[in-house]
Amino acid sequence: MKNNNFRLSAAGKLAAALAIILAASAGAYAAEIVAANGANGPGVSTAATGAQVVDIVAPNGNGLSHNQYQDFNVNQPGAVLNNSREAGLSQLAGQLGANPNLGGREASVILNEVIGRNPSLLHGQQEIFGMAADYVLANPNGISCQSCGFINTSHSSLVVGNPLVENGVLQGYSTFGNRNTLSLNGTLNAGGVLDLIAPKIDSRGEVIVQDFKQSNGKVTSAAINAISGLNRVARDGTVQASQQMPTALDSYYLGSMQAGRINIINTAQGSGVKLAGSLNAGDELKVKAYDIRSESRVDDASSNKNGGDNYQNYRGGIYVNDRSSSQTLTRTELKGKNISLVADNHAHLTATDIRGEDITLQGGKLTLDGQQLKQTQGHTDDRWFYSWQYDVTREREQLQQAGSTVAASGSAKLISTQEDVKLLGANVSADRALSVKAARDVHLAGLVEKDKSSERGYQRNHTSSLRTGRWSNSDESESLKASELRSEGELTLKAGRNVSTQGAKVHAQRDLTIDADNQIQVGVQKTANAKAVRDDKTSWGGIGGGDNKNNSNRREISHASELTSGGTLRLNGQQGVTITGSKARGQKGGEVTATHGGLRIDNALSTTVDKIDARTGTAFNITSSSHKADNSYQSSTASELKSDTNLTLVSHKDADVIGSQVASGGELSVESKTGNINVKAAERQQNIDEQKTALTVNGYAKEAGDKQYRAGLRIEHTRDSEKTTRTENSASSLSGGSVKLKAEKDVTFSGSKLVADKGDASVSGNKVSFLAADDKTASNTEQTKIGGGFYYTGGIDKLGSGVEAGYENNKTQAQSSKAITSGSDVKGNLTINARDKLTQQGAQHSVGGAYQENAAGVDHLAAADTASTTTTKTDVGVNIGANVDYSAVTRPVERAVGKAAKLDATGVINDIGGIGAPNVGLDIGAQGGSSEKRSSSSQAVVSSVQAGSIDINAKGEVRDQGTQYQASKGAVNLTADSHRSEAAANRQDEQSRDTRGSAGVRVYTTTGSDLTVDAKGEGGTQRSNSSASQAVTGSIDAANGINVNVKKDAIYQGTALNGGRGKTAVNAGGDIRLDQASDKQSESRSGFNVKASAKGGFTADSKNFGAGFGGGTHNGESSSSTAQVGNISGQQGVELKAGRDLTLQGTDVKSQGDVSLSAGNKVALQAAESTQTRKESKLSGNIDLGAGSSDSKEKTGGNLSAGGAFDIAKVNESATERQGATIASDGKVTLSANGKGDDALHLQGAKVSGGSAALEAKNGGILLESAKNEQHKDNWSLGIKANAKGGQTFNKDAGGKVDPNTGKDTHTLGAGLKVGVEQQDKTTHANTGITAGDVTLNSGKDTRLAGARVDADSVQGKVGGDLHVESRKDVENGVKVDVDAGLSHSNDPGSSITSKLSKVGTPRYAGKVKEKLEAGVNKVADATTDKYNSVARRLDPQQDTTGAVSFSKAEGKVTLPATPAGEKPQGPLWDRGARTVGGAVKDSITGPAGRQGHLKVNADVVNNNAVGEQSAIAGKNGVALQVGGQTQLTGGEIRSQQGKVELGGSQVSQQDVNGQRYQGGGRVDAAATVGGLLGGAAKQSVAGNVPFASGHASTQQADAKAGVFSGK
């Protein structure tokens, strides 16, 4: 047996205790009215007005009176019963008289039995006095009322046990084995009927019953019968038997009842009924029990103060405090006009208010719930004083709900009878009908409500920023409390298992029926909100730095569930129906069924989590900034199932719609019966998991190349990181204004949508899919930098300072993918049925009239959008500086001031002799490298069918991939067993690698009597790959034509058939292709490079050293292929019909009528190919050596050196381009072929126009070729450099020895060569023409034109063997050469031009600027040898013999003129080459740089080999053909020009072709000096050329001829 414990609030417990105490003490006071002993006792009297009086017994004769007692108590001066037979007054015993025991008979029942052993105690009132009767008090030893009542009653009974009386009648009451109590407390009053019959009722105050008028304006009414356990009752509280009990008694009603019928029964069996506070019935309110409990009243309140400037000491204190807490409620009201609470176990309503007009709540478990109340606040303050502190505490908590209210005013029934119906945040209403019925489940939830807040605290030295630490905040907020059902006309939820909605609100304003017998769950409740921040600080205790934090946030909310009607919405269940993100509507339509499983219209999801764990710092709390996080977001709620009329979803397993919305507004019907229809998308996710940190000091001002600069300061430490995962997509929709989907397995769209807003759409099943949906991102990102600092340098190559460091690391990985599509949008016709397979993937549709696909085949595909990236980089640094360099005097005076603004003067005397000197030193380097990059991408997404008719049926393949049909108002029909239209691509790839290097060292002075170390390094690796491919194509356009009709093959790839305003028909039965579509590209590179070097040093007086080495290799490769084509159009013509073969590849066929290409084996028209390729390869190297030494006190010597360097490069190019096909027409062009080979009609460079032409090939022949474009090059180049140096020098003595005849020897050699060769082979023709104005060539083998051209105004046909008209050629061979040589020698002395203009005064004044530039170049070569010996002694007269005197300070000597002797000098040739061009222009300005050089060569050659179009058969009103064997011609032509050429008698055979065209080349440039052959013959005569060679040639003659001309 179940025990129910009724929990009282603290106030309730106090009230109960007081009632017991009062009852006990009042019992002591009320021990009065005793009677009994014989003939049923009474007498008893007191009055004047301590009331009592009684007198009654006598009647029976069934006016019963039957009193007995031994005790019975009343007091507070009440009682009187008398029942009169006159005298008068009373209202508690004023005056009185009559009774003596009523021999003349009144009564009509007054019983009062007790018969000893106490309780009764009633503490006031009872009167009857004259006539009106019915009153019973029976006792077995309970009853205590306290303020009790009655007076002249019309039926009041309080019983607790016994009388039944039989033949003297009464016949009611017993309560069998009895366990006492009926206890009421304060105010009872009564009037018409009140029976409270016990074991156990304990009511606790106010029971007021009224109505009762009589004497005899009869009324009575107002009733209360509250009967509790053991029973056998009647008189007419009926019950008539029951027993069981030992233990569990319950029944208290805990304050107030009024009446106009209230009838509360508890007939034990686990007992029950406890209500609390007011039942009011203005007509009927019944409660029956084995449990029913209804609760309210929670009081509680509290507070707690302190303050008033609390204090402690020693030197510091204050602690403030306020606290509070409270709850209050007092509700429970049940009013009346038919309310019935029945429970035969449970029925539990907690914060109750139930009003009335029909309301039945039953039991066997039914719970409407609520209550929880708690409010509490807080506040503490805490402060302290020495070494300051300040604490704070704040709290707050509210959790509130209250729940339950059922208000009907016309029907509402909530029943369970055996288990469930719970409503929780309830509020049920109705204004005629609402019914919830269970016997397991029906759930509907709600409640929650919270609001918490907190703050903690503690700081210590507090502020002016001596802050110290600890803090904590929190904030939590949830709310909800829903659950509402409301009616105003019909609403039924019924279960038998399940129906559960959670964020409920269910409304109907007629019809809303939810039925179940397993399932229907219309979801979501969830709520949360939270926040937390922690703080941790420090300022001066962290010497000015601090901060940490520990943030958080969490937010889920979802709530929905709203089912609303306004007319029809029926959801049925029977093992299915789940709507989760909720809302379902009706407004006169709906019905969702799932009789035996399926249907789920999903989404909800809500998560937000943010965590961060920050930190700042600096100064000695260092860090300065960090941030972690652990983000996560999902959201989405959708699910809306609507109708503003018609919506039917039936299912018997499956039929999911997941991102949701299903609407209507006129028929939408979705069915499954048994299996599938899924219309998906939804998935939502985002995780990011960040880390950040930074410590930065900065500074800087940059550019540290070319003209140089840099500034400085930098400390850096950065570390970022991110992980990202993102998956979005939400869609899903099926709308209405007509849509029908039916399955019996399959029908899937995935990125979703099918709308049809006002007219047609239907999709059936066994596989139909429209697919896509992706949206993805995944990412890893990392960055690490470490850092370093200090710097300044300066400009145009150095000033100084240094120190740096480095390290950097970047990683990126990313993937992505987008696509989401699926489609349609209709508004008139769309029919897709497939009883196996129709799959579209990039689908979009949008219809607007017809578009139908019926299947067992059909694919349409594409869809992609994706991307991928991998980037990795690692770098190192290091640098140490100090400087002044002055880059060997500022880059030889910035390359001799732009080679003196390009007038050059031999590289402004070789950049002023390479200047040289300043330096101070130290640089140590190091760099780093490594990198990787990969990238990939792919777009495409196609499929699209816009419509206004398109019709595709298949029972075997139709597969497009670059699809897009569009047909806006008319045709495109395709019936199949094959048709395939491929293309679609868009891809790009890329890979790379980069590995670098470098090193350094430079230690220098010039001159701190010297030292040099120089060393270098370098590194290598590069690699790269790339690839690309576009194409996408596809399309069939139409507005009124195209009609493909296939039973095997018809394959297009560069597609686009148009059909505008009529016809384009393709009809296969084997083959028809239109191929090509390409766009490709590829590339690959590779690398390597290495270098090294070293240098050496010392002087006072010198040593040197050198070294070198080098590196190279590189590779290449490239490729491409473009073409695309496709296109065939309409305007009432074009028909292609095959039946095996018909291939166009360079397609583009137009029309304004007729064009028919047929086959039955082969018709070809090929070409279209485009391709290019290029290869490369490089190899290079160099080597340098060196040595040195010298000695001095005056000289010894040394030196060696060498050089090197070569590079070899090779490229190998190629190209092929052909295009071909294009047929135009403005009337007839028919090319037919019917097999039997020799190439049953085949055109290759085709063009064909129209206004008639028909080339057939009745069983073999016709070729008409060309189109061949090729090109090839085989380029290479070679470069060689060399060098050498030399040395030796002796002298010494005056004790330093070495002389051996005092050496010298010095040299500088050179060399050099560059050769570049480009070769080429080229072949070109394109021909095939046929232009028309009549042309017919039939063949039955042979007819072959090979380059081709038929022009026409007539040319007729039949060949039947031979007729070749050839021509072709076009060949070009190429060669193009460039050579650039060199040569040099020197024999040093600074390789003068006066030792390179004596290095403009440095190293240290360069021999006093080479003795003032060799004394004004020997005083301008002795005043130009005395004005060229006074103009060669006036143009010779045997010339004067007196020479000039010259002086050289450097050699300390005077040179006198030579004394003539012997023969006189030879005279003119003019004057011996103007005395060998001015002493070779004064030994090319004073001294060595002996022999220099150059030679440049260019050459071109082309070769050609001719024709360049001919081939012909022309026409202009003649040529009739009928050949039947031979005609040949080879150089071409058969012509007419206004008449004749017939060839019915054939033979003819002519040849001619020959050809030629040649071009030529030349050019050499020379010098190896005499002023660079006088300034490159004044720069090749200021670039009008010729001096020093040239050339060219040309040859033509091109022939082709051959013949038959007639009318010419």
Curated annotation (Swiss-Prot):
Locations listed in the record: Cell outer membrane
Bias (Polar residues): 303-313, 460-474, 727-736, 1021-1030
Superkingdom of origin organism: Bacteria
Biased composition (Basic and acidic residues): 478-488, 716-726, 977-996
One cellular component term from this protein's GO annotations in UniProt: cell outer membrane
Pfam families: Fil_haemagg_2, TPS
Residues making up the signal peptide according to the UniProt record: 1-30
SUPFAM superfamilies noted in UniProt: Pectin lyase-like
The keyword Manganese belongs to this UniProt entry's keyword annotation: no
Biological process according to GO: killing of cells of another organism
InterPro entries, per the entry: FhaB/CdiA-like_TPS (IPR008638), Hemagglutinin_rpt (IPR025157), Pectin_lyas_fold (IPR012334), Pectin_lyase_fold/virulence (IPR011050)
Residue numbers spanned by region Disordered: 296-315, 452-488, 716-737, 971-1030, 1168-1199, 1437-1469
Stated role: Bacterial hemolysins are exotoxins that attack blood cell membranes and cause cell rupture by mechanisms not clearly defined. Cell-bound hemolysin, which releases heme-iron from erythrocytes by interaction with the erythrocyte membrane. ShlA requires ShlB function.
UniProt protein name: Hemolysin
